[in-house]
Curated annotation (Swiss-Prot):
UniProt cross-references to Pfam families, sorted A to Z: Sua5_yciO_yrdC
Gene this chain is encoded by: tsaC
Designated name of the protein: Threonylcarbamoyl-AMP synthase
Example GO BP: tRNA threonylcarbamoyladenosine modification
Residue ranges constituting the YrdC-like domain according to the UniProt record: 1-175
Keyword vocabulary terms for this entry: ATP-binding, Cytoplasm, Nucleotide-binding, Nucleotidyltransferase, Transferase, tRNA processing
Uppermost EC category: transferase
Gene Ontology cellular component list: cytoplasm
EC number: 2.7.7.87
Job description of the protein: Required for the formation of a threonylcarbamoyl group on adenosine at position 37 (t(6)A37) in tRNAs that read codons beginning with adenine. Catalyzes the conversion of L-threonine, HCO(3)(-)/CO(2) and ATP to give threonylcarbamoyl-AMP (TC-AMP) as the acyladenylate intermediate, with the release of diphosphate.
Any one GO MF annotation of this record: double-stranded RNA binding
Length: 175
Protein backbone atom coordinates (compact mmCIF):
# COMPACT_ATOMS: atom_id res chain seq x y z
CA UNK A 1 0.00 0.00 0.00
CA UNK A 2 2.76 2.44 0.85
CA UNK A 3 4.29 1.87 -2.59
CA UNK A 4 0.97 3.00 -4.14
CA UNK A 5 0.92 6.49 -2.59
CA UNK A 6 -1.55 5.37 0.07
CA UNK A 7 -1.82 6.57 3.65
CA UNK A 8 -2.15 3.94 6.38
CA UNK A 9 -2.77 3.89 10.11
CA UNK A 10 -0.38 1.86 12.25
CA UNK A 11 0.47 1.38 15.93
CA UNK A 12 3.31 3.44 17.37
CA UNK A 13 4.94 3.62 20.80
CA UNK A 14 2.01 5.55 22.33
CA UNK A 15 -0.93 5.76 19.88
CA UNK A 16 -1.94 5.03 16.32
CA UNK A 17 -0.08 6.99 13.70
CA UNK A 18 -0.70 7.87 10.09
CA UNK A 19 2.05 7.06 7.68
CA UNK A 20 3.01 7.18 4.04
CA UNK A 21 5.97 7.09 1.69
CA UNK A 22 8.10 10.13 2.60
CA UNK A 23 9.37 10.43 -0.97
CA UNK A 24 5.89 10.63 -2.49
CA UNK A 25 4.58 14.19 -2.66
CA UNK A 26 1.18 12.76 -3.65
CA UNK A 27 1.02 10.51 -0.57
CA UNK A 28 2.15 13.28 1.78
CA UNK A 29 -0.46 15.66 0.34
CA UNK A 30 -3.13 12.99 0.98
CA UNK A 31 -1.94 12.66 4.57
CA UNK A 32 -1.88 16.42 5.15
CA UNK A 33 -5.38 16.77 3.68
CA UNK A 34 -6.70 13.94 5.88
CA UNK A 35 -5.35 15.66 8.99
CA UNK A 36 -6.09 19.21 7.85
CA UNK A 37 -2.43 19.95 8.64
CA UNK A 38 -0.19 22.65 7.21
CA UNK A 39 2.79 21.60 5.09
CA UNK A 40 4.77 24.33 6.90
CA UNK A 41 4.94 22.27 10.11
CA UNK A 42 7.06 19.48 8.62
CA UNK A 43 6.66 15.80 9.47
CA UNK A 44 8.40 13.12 11.50
CA UNK A 45 10.06 10.13 9.88
CA UNK A 46 10.32 6.83 11.75
CA UNK A 47 12.80 4.13 10.86
CA UNK A 48 13.99 0.75 12.02
CA UNK A 49 17.62 1.87 11.85
CA UNK A 50 19.70 4.92 11.06
CA UNK A 51 20.50 3.74 7.53
CA UNK A 52 16.84 4.29 6.61
CA UNK A 53 17.04 8.02 7.40
CA UNK A 54 20.62 8.82 6.32
CA UNK A 55 19.45 10.10 2.93
CA UNK A 56 17.60 12.97 4.67
CA UNK A 57 20.18 13.94 7.32
CA UNK A 58 23.27 16.11 6.82
CA UNK A 59 25.56 14.17 9.14
CA UNK A 60 28.58 16.35 8.33
CA UNK A 61 27.16 19.17 10.44
CA UNK A 62 26.81 16.98 13.54
CA UNK A 63 29.60 16.86 16.12
CA UNK A 64 30.72 13.59 17.70
CA UNK A 65 29.10 14.73 20.95
CA UNK A 66 25.76 15.28 19.19
CA UNK A 67 25.98 11.89 17.47
CA UNK A 68 26.71 10.19 20.80
CA UNK A 69 23.64 11.83 22.35
CA UNK A 70 21.42 10.73 19.45
CA UNK A 71 22.62 7.13 19.47
CA UNK A 72 22.42 6.97 23.27
CA UNK A 73 18.64 7.51 22.95
CA UNK A 74 18.08 5.33 19.87
CA UNK A 75 16.36 3.09 19.29
CA UNK A 76 13.66 4.58 21.47
CA UNK A 77 10.86 7.13 21.85
CA UNK A 78 13.03 10.16 21.06
CA UNK A 79 12.58 12.25 17.93
CA UNK A 80 15.50 14.45 16.99
CA UNK A 81 15.49 17.52 14.76
CA UNK A 82 18.62 17.00 12.69
CA UNK A 83 20.11 19.14 9.92
CA UNK A 84 18.41 18.24 6.65
CA UNK A 85 20.31 17.54 3.47
CA UNK A 86 19.62 20.19 0.81
CA UNK A 87 17.69 17.68 -1.32
CA UNK A 88 15.31 16.65 1.48
CA UNK A 89 11.78 17.33 0.21
CA UNK A 90 10.18 20.48 1.61
CA UNK A 91 7.03 18.51 2.43
CA UNK A 92 9.11 16.74 5.10
CA UNK A 93 11.00 19.74 6.51
CA UNK A 94 8.23 22.32 6.22
CA UNK A 95 9.57 25.81 6.81
CA UNK A 96 12.64 24.47 8.65
CA UNK A 97 16.17 23.45 7.67
CA UNK A 98 15.90 20.39 9.90
CA UNK A 99 14.20 17.03 9.52
CA UNK A 100 12.48 15.27 12.43
CA UNK A 101 13.57 11.64 12.70
CA UNK A 102 13.17 8.73 15.13
CA UNK A 103 14.73 5.29 15.13
CA UNK A 104 12.10 3.29 16.94
CA UNK A 105 12.38 0.30 19.25
CA UNK A 106 8.67 -0.46 18.78
CA UNK A 107 8.22 -3.85 17.11
CA UNK A 108 5.32 -2.75 14.88
CA UNK A 109 7.25 0.23 13.50
CA UNK A 110 10.37 -1.87 12.93
CA UNK A 111 8.30 -4.47 11.11
CA UNK A 112 6.56 -1.82 8.97
CA UNK A 113 9.77 0.00 7.99
CA UNK A 114 11.60 -3.24 7.23
CA UNK A 115 8.72 -4.52 5.08
CA UNK A 116 8.55 -1.18 3.24
CA UNK A 117 12.34 -1.06 2.96
CA UNK A 118 12.70 2.50 4.18
CA UNK A 119 11.58 5.13 6.67
CA UNK A 120 7.90 6.06 6.91
CA UNK A 121 6.20 9.37 7.69
CA UNK A 122 4.75 9.32 11.20
CA UNK A 123 2.14 11.66 12.58
CA UNK A 124 -0.65 11.05 15.07
CA UNK A 125 -3.80 9.45 13.69
CA UNK A 126 -6.23 12.32 14.18
CA UNK A 127 -7.49 15.52 12.63
CA UNK A 128 -5.10 18.32 13.65
CA UNK A 129 -5.74 19.59 17.18
CA UNK A 130 -8.15 16.73 17.95
CA UNK A 131 -7.61 13.77 20.28
CA UNK A 132 -5.36 11.09 18.74
CA UNK A 133 -6.61 7.55 18.11
CA UNK A 134 -5.56 4.87 20.59
CA UNK A 135 -7.55 1.96 19.14
CA UNK A 136 -8.36 0.63 15.69
CA UNK A 137 -12.02 1.44 16.39
CA UNK A 138 -11.12 5.10 16.93
CA UNK A 139 -9.12 5.11 13.66
CA UNK A 140 -12.13 3.77 11.74
CA UNK A 141 -14.46 6.25 13.44
CA UNK A 142 -12.16 9.15 12.52
CA UNK A 143 -11.17 8.13 8.97
CA UNK A 144 -13.84 5.65 7.85
CA UNK A 145 -14.45 1.92 8.21
CA UNK A 146 -12.37 1.04 5.15
CA UNK A 147 -9.29 3.05 6.10
CA UNK A 148 -6.10 0.97 5.62
CA UNK A 149 -4.86 -0.12 9.03
CA UNK A 150 -1.90 -2.23 10.10
CA UNK A 151 -3.17 -4.30 12.99
CA UNK A 152 -0.98 -4.50 16.04
CA UNK A 153 -0.52 -3.18 19.55
CA UNK A 154 0.51 0.30 20.51
CA UNK A 155 3.50 0.47 22.83
CA UNK A 156 3.64 1.28 26.52
CA UNK A 157 4.63 4.94 26.22
CA UNK A 158 2.02 7.22 27.81
CA UNK A 159 2.95 10.27 25.74
CA UNK A 160 4.14 11.08 22.23
CA UNK A 161 7.88 10.98 21.64
CA UNK A 162 10.03 13.72 23.09
CA UNK A 163 11.35 16.05 20.38
CA UNK A 164 14.86 17.42 20.80
CA UNK A 165 16.58 19.91 18.51
CA UNK A 166 20.09 18.48 18.42
CA UNK A 167 21.53 21.67 16.91
CA UNK A 168 20.68 23.95 19.84
CA UNK A 169 19.84 21.32 22.46
CA UNK A 170 16.31 22.65 23.03
CA UNK A 171 13.53 20.31 24.07
CA UNK A 172 10.68 21.06 21.66
CA UNK A 173 8.11 18.64 23.05
CA UNK A 174 8.19 17.09 26.49
CA UNK A 175 4.92 15.77 27.84
Amino acid sequence: MLHNDDVIAYPTESMFGLGCDPNSKKAVKKLLNLKNRSIEKGLILVASDFDQIKMYVNENILSNKQKKKIFFHWPGPFTFLLPAKPNTPYWLTGKFNTVAVRVSAHFEIIKLCNAFGQAVVSTSANISNMTPCFTSEEVFKCFGKDFPLLNGKIGNEKNPSKIINIINGKLIRYV
